[in-house]
Amino acid sequence: MFEINPVKNRIQDLSDRTAVLRGYLCDYDAKKERLEEVNAELEQPDVWNEPERAQALGKERSTLEEIVTTIDQLEQGLEDVSGLLELAVEADDEETFNETIAELEVLDGKLGQLEFRRMFSGEYDRANCYLDLQAGSGGTEAQDWASMLLRMYLRWAESRGFKTEIIEESDGDVAGLKSATVKIIGEYAFGWLRTETGVHRLVRKSPFDSGGRRHTSFSSAFVYPEVDDDIDIEINPADLRIDVYRASGAGGQHVNKTESAVRITHIPTNIVTQCQNDRSQHKNKDQAMKQLKAKLYEFEMQKKNADKQVLEDNKSDIGWGSQIRSYVLDDSRIKDLRTGVETRNTQAVLDGDLDKFIEASLKAGL
C-alpha cells in the first residue's frame, strides 16, 4: 500500500502556492487580458511601421506569456496529477504512483522558477547592468582582492550565460587592480546582481607578506542598471569635468600610445565614470556618459528611498552599501553577513559559484 497522504499534502501545497501566484503576486487575470490586447496589436498589418513600439510589444508579450502559460500549465498539471494519483490507488499500481511523484517534481520545479522570477519585479531588473569594483585601503593585498572579485564575477556571469565586456581596468601598483568596471549583458542581469552591492571582506595569509602573516582587506562592489537613452536624466555640461589620459592594463600594443581613455566627474555628486576599452576617445566618452547617466539614475533612486531606508534600518550604509560578505580563506569559510548563508567550499565560490548567496539575498528581499 502506498503512503498517499504525503503526496496529497504536496499536491495541496503546490495548489496553494499556485493560487497565491495567480492572485496578488502575478495578477493573472489582468495579465491574461493584457496578453490578448498585445497579441491583437501585434497582428495589425501596420505594427512594424513603428519598429521600436513593435519590439517593445514583442518583449512585453514574451514576459506575459511566461507568467500566463506557466500558471495554465501548473493548474492543468496539478489537476492531471490528482487524477493520476486516484488511478494509482484504485489499481494499486506502483508504476503509476511513481509517475505521479515524478510529475510532482516537474511541477514543483516550474513553480519554484516562477516564484523566483517574481522577485525580479523592479523597473530595471530585466536590464543589463554595470559592476564597479574598487580596491579599499590595504595596498597590494586589497588590489589583488579586487582582481579576485573581478574574476569571480566574470566566471559567475559566464556560468549563467551572460555576456561580459570590461569597460575599464586600472592596474594595481604591484599586482591586482585599483578599480574595474564590467558590463554584464543579458536578461535579468541587474535583477540577479543588484544585491551584490556592498563591501567584501577578505581574510587570508597574504602571498605578498614574506612573513606569511594574516591580513584583512576590503573591496567594494557597486551594481547599477543600464538605463534607456531616453530616460529623463538632465546633465548640465557645466557640472562635468572631463579628463583624458593614456589607458592602462590589457588592450593591445597600441593601448598606451594615445590619450584615448576618458574620465568624467559629475561635480555636484562627485560621481565618476571612466572608459578605456576602445581606441577611440569619442567612443570612450560616449560610453562613460552612458555610465554616468545610469549612475545618476541609481543615485536619484537611492535618494528617494533614503528616508524610508533610514527609518527601517538605521544601520544600513546607503550608497556603496555596508559589508555584505566575509571570505575567510584560512578557515575555509565564506559567510554572507546579511542572510547567514555560508559555505566551506571557498574555491568554488571564488570560481563563480555565487547562486546560493544571491538567491538567499533575493528571497530575503534585500
Curated annotation (Swiss-Prot):
GO terms for cellular component: cytoplasm. SMART domains: PCRF. It is found in: Cytoplasm. Transmembrane segments: none annotated. Its main location: cytoplasm. It holds the Pfam family PCRF. Methylated by PrmC. Methylation increases the termination efficiency of RF2. GO terms for biological process: viral translational frameshifting. One of its GO terms (molecular function) is translation release factor activity, codon specific. SUPFAM superfamilies: Release factor. Keywords: Cytoplasm, Methylation, Protein biosynthesis. The modification N5-methylglutamine is found at residue 253. Belongs to the prokaryotic/mitochondrial release factor family. The gene for this protein contains a UGA in-frame termination codon after Leu-25; a naturally occurring frameshift enables complete translation of RF-2. This provides a mechanism for the protein to regulate its own production. Peptide chain release factor 2 directs the termination of translation in response to the peptide chain termination codons UGA and UAA. This is Peptide chain release factor 2. It comes from Yersinia pestis.
